[in-house]
Amino acid sequence: LLSDARAEAVESSVSELERLAISHDASHYLLVPAGLVRPDSAEDVANIFRAAGDLGLPLTFRSGGTSLSGQSSGDGLMVDTRRHFKKIEVLEDGKKVRVQPGATIMMVNNYLAPYGYKLGPDPASWSACTIGGVVANNSSGMSSGTKYNTYNTLDSMVLVLPSGTIIDTAEPDADQKLRSLEPELHEGLLRLRKRVLENPESMAKIRQQYSMKNTMGYGLNSLVDFETPVDILQHLLIGSEGTLGFVASATYRTLPILKNISTGLLVFDNLIDAARSVPELVANKLATVELMDATSIRVAQRTGQAAEALAAIDVKDHAALLVEFQGNSEQELSDLAAAAAPMFKSLPVASPVSMTSKLSERNALWAARRGLYTTVAGNRRSGTNALLEDVVVPVEVLGNTCSDLTKLFDSHGYQDSVIFGHAKDGNIHFMLNEQFRDPKQLDRYRDF
């Protein structure tokens, strides 16, 4: 296959050094690929798909490698898209943008900023994560929630199927082309949609599950939300972790940049009080509500660069919520703050609520949250693995969920665990540090 790739002028390598170098990503898995290719077009990928299919060789696509779950690792053929798939094309004066999978969120937003727009997805790893992974994981982030994730802001994509078929879903005849080139797939998607629509219980379950952040399995909501197979297919690829095909480019509908913003840190005596305050904050139109537990705060303080509001906390069992109002104008921002004032006074906070619109102060607060995972993971005991889980529950039961988690940590001896995340969406991360070379520690992890 690599000989064929070289004949087609596609970069390829079986060098042990290169294979070892690309085997490392942000996860704790280590799988060394058998070979490496760096295509520079959708047609190259189509040819690689066909050749790999003939040989029964599995493919893994790799862009930023920032996922903590190991999706960018594999021991078959590694298809590296970081070098040649970085094109960014601003469309309609910034209202849309066409992006290839090797471009980072930060790169795209830098292109869009002069037009006053940005992408919807805003993960904490925005400076390093790439569009390929953002599509493959249906990434959202701090304020995008489910409303502005890739699934809900995608306009079209150029996709490559394992058969080598290339479809540009923006073309008027895209669905006809799919039916002509992939009749079995086209018909199968229609049958699946019909099956779901004829089952009210399935419909209700899908609606309920996808009212929250949900990237478990394939995006079955596409069978409910879209009618044509080509629309269903392109939305099934979102969140499919690279298992259904390759996204050679994605065109997004963008969001206007709101310049009227105020940010604050709400400090609580304990995690449960903080978590149980979230529904009220959501009801009062806070654009972001980010949770940090006591361990998160301590780690942020130890960097020596924590914002004044964070550095001032005498941490015991405290927790904090980083919150933000966003408005189209100063008046809208003022109205949001005024409407929420009675709610702020009713919260069981440990210190007075203070909001700031100063960019330097806001950036200092956000720096602690955006760098939280790397800072916490970097402070773990030597020889341990940082294991991050990602769960979502209805916001109304977030407090009970955090309470149950802390009891689990205590009962299994995970005193150094951390809870943080996107509380506005009921989406929290918790981190365990474990030493897997010790059989007893492995048993503890299994029991947990």
Question: For the regions a protein language model found, what residue spans apply to each?
Answer:
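Extended, hydrophobic alpha-helical segments in both membrane/secreted and soluble proteins
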Residues: L59-F61, L68, G264, A274, ...
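C-terminal substrate-binding/cap subdomain adjacent to the FAD-binding core in PCMH-type
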Residues: V134-A136, S143-K147, L154-R370, T374, ...
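N-terminal flexible segment immediately upstream of the FAD-binding catalytic core
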Residues: L1-D54, G64-K95, A124, P172, ...
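Generic non-transmembrane alpha-helical segments
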Residues: L1-A9, N47-L55, Y111, R276-K285, ...
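N-terminal glycine-rich flavin-associated loop
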Residues: S27-L59, T81-P123, S139-R191, P256-D269, ...
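Signature for HUH/AEP ssDNA processing cores
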Residues: N379-T406
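Short, hydrophobic/aliphatic alpha-helical segments
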Residues: D44-P58, L112-C129, G217-L237, A364-A367, ...
